[in-house]
């Protein structure tokens, strides 16, 4: 088996690696082909190519304040009076997810928000501390992704360790709250739930044995 592996694949030298064209591809953001498909459909709707970036930023800015989940309803105006912003967002959703799309522009949004001193509108309701309020958006990880679009001059500043921790913690809390709404308990009685949200009996106060 070992000999077969060595025959099929061998460790390349630095010189061999240098001959390869390796681009950054990440499933956190849309692929080039997905972005091209979005642009093509926007053009079919009548949007001018010169306005593509402005409208992408408009979508990402809305989601910065309102979230980019599957259930969010994008509102606002595009640069065209004939095309509402939700219609452009609908095209995005045909080829990718809104969150992946927004991640691609996260660095641009981050810089703009810092420059204008505009944290996400719902930072307080999400229980962020004031010091970490600029991290209170759900595509925050795009700010640190090398696959995201980099603004001229780079980031105004990198996210702080506390901001990263606050966002990750809030993400886990949100996932837990979402899962708890789908609890698999057959009753809502507090005798069973102990007053706690849970998707399994152990977290609700019952012993739970994972199936073999």
UniProtKB/Swiss-Prot annotation:
InterPro entries the record matches: Pltvir_coat
Annotated protein name in UniProt: Coat protein
GO cellular component terms attached to this protein's record: helical viral capsid; ribonucleoprotein complex
Gene Ontology molecular functions: structural molecule activity
Job of this protein: Required for genome encapsidation. Forms ribonucleoprotein complexes along with TGB1 helicase and viral RNA.
Keyword field: Capsid protein, Helical capsid protein, Ribonucleoprotein, Virion
Main location: virion
Positions of disulphide bridges: none
UniProt entry tagged with the keyword Ribonucleoprotein: yes
One Pfam family this sequence matches: Flexi_CP
Keyword RNA-binding in annotation: no
Family: Belongs to the potexvirus capsid protein family.
Protein's cellular compartments: Virion
